Regions:
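Flexible "arm" and connector segments at domain edges
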Residues: 1-60, 64-107
Length: 107
């Protein structure tokens, strides 16, 4: 069985790919990367609606790539962003309603 690369290794490879393709230069507008992310989210939603696991896997991966590149364009790492989100949600109170977790301030 083929072993998957860890997320940190993949982030480094994606960063090198993005740099090689000019996505990390000062002339690039991060807003364009955000538009690419929205496109990929749409494709991911389509895969989910049509119950296509292979396309869903690809879509989720594409979204992660877009987020990694967007973070790097702003001089941040995906780990830094994820840690900030974790610190915000780890003690969050709320409840599950209709399959979604709603924080207590939204109830």
């Amino acid at each position: 069985m083929k072993k998957n690369k860890d997320l940190n290794t993949l982030r480094q490879l994606i960063r090198m790919w993005a740099n090689y393709h000019g996505l990390l230069t000062k002339d690039v507008q991060p807003e364009k990367q955000m538009l690419k992310l929205v496109e990929e989210v749409g494709e991911t939603a389509r895969a989910l609606v049509y119950d296509n696991k292979d396309e869903l896997r690809d879509g989720i991966g594409d979204c992660v790539v877009c987020l990694i590149v967007l973070a790097e364009q702003w001089g941040m790492s995906i780990e830094e962003c994820t840690e900030a989100a974790w610190k915000e949600i780890k003690g969050r109170k709320g409840k599950l309603e209709d399959g979604l977790f709603k924080k207590h301030t939204d109830l």
